[in-house]
Amino acid sequence: MQIGSRYGALLLAAVASVIAFASAAQSTSPALVWPNKARAAVSLAYDDALDSQLDIAVPALNRHGLKASFYLTLGSDTVRKRLVAWRRVASAGHELGNHTLFHQCSRSPPDRNWVTPDNDLDTISAAQLVAQIRLGNTLLQAIDGKQERTFAAPCGDLNASGEPYLEPLKGDFIAMKSAFGSVVPDMQTLDAYAVGVEVASDVTGDQLIALVRRAAAAGTMVNITFHGVGGDYLAVSRKAHEELLRYLASHRDIYWTDTFLRIMQYVKAQRVKDQPVSLRQTLQ
C-alpha cells in the first residue's frame, strides 16, 4: 500500500513538473518571427465564390502581386459556370478553400430570413454536413490538384441540428476560420481551428488600413474576409479594396500578405521549432 501511494505521489509530481515546465516555456516563448522580418501577417479572404471576386478582386490582387484565399461555395452557379476562371485563380498562386457545398447556415437567429428552409443548418445532421464538406475537398482537388486545405465556416455557425460538426474535420484541414475577431492577440496561443475573422462590408480604405496597422503594432496577424468587391452583396467598394491592396503592396517590409493556408503552415512549423527540445521529447 505504501509502495503504491509512493508511486502515485511520484507520478503526480512528474506530471506536475511537465505541466509547470510547459507553462513556463509558453510564458517565456518568443514572439513569432514572420518571414523576411515582417511585423505582421495579413490573410485576405473572399467568401462565397462571387462574380465580383473574379472580375475585380482577382485582377487587382494579381496586379499588386498579393496572394489571397477564396472560400468557394461549391454548389454555386459561379463555380459551375466559371470553373475555368477559378482554376486560373489557383494557378496564379491563390488558395481555393472549402466553404461547404451549399453554404448552410442556421435560420433561427434574428435577421436570418434569407436562409432558405432547404439550407437551414438546424435541419441537417452533423454527420451529413461532415460528409458534404469532405466531398467539397474532393471537388476542390479536382479543380486545383491540391490536397492541403483550409476551411471557413459559413456564418460562423458551429452546430448542425445542435451538434458540433468541426471536431471530426480537424484532420481534414490545416486550419479553420470559425470565429469572429480582427487582430490575433497572441500567435502562440492561437487555436488553428478557431481563427477569428473581421468581415469587411461598407468600410473605407482607411478603415481597412487601420486594421492591418493594428496587427503590425501587435506583431501578430489579421484575417480580413470580403464578400462582394464593387458589386454583389456585403460589398466593399472597388476604391476601398484598391487602397488596401496598394498599401500592403507598398509596405511589404512590414506586412506578409499570403494565403491563409501558407500562413498557418508557417505558424504551425514555427511553434514546433520554438519549443525547447526537452519539452518536445517530453510531449511526444
Each model region followed by its residue ranges:
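Metal-dependent polysaccharide deacetylase catalytic core of the NodB/CE4 family, i.e.
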Residues: 40-42, 62-161, 171-172, 179-195, ...
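Bacterial N-terminal signal peptides that target proteins for export
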Residues: 1-11
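Generic structural signal for well-ordered alpha-helices
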Residues: 54, 58, 83-87, 130-137, ...
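N-terminal signal peptide c-region/cleavage motif recognized by signal peptidases
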Residues: 20-22
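Boundary/entry segment of secreted carbohydrate-active catalytic domains
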Residues: 27-54, 198
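C-terminal domain-boundary segment and adjacent tail
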Residues: 28-36, 68, 78, 141, ...
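Soluble non-cytosolic domains of exported or imported proteins
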Residues: 48-52, 80, 123-131, 202, ...
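Active-site metal-binding loops of divalent metal-dependent hydrolases
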Residues: 46-49, 100, 228, 260
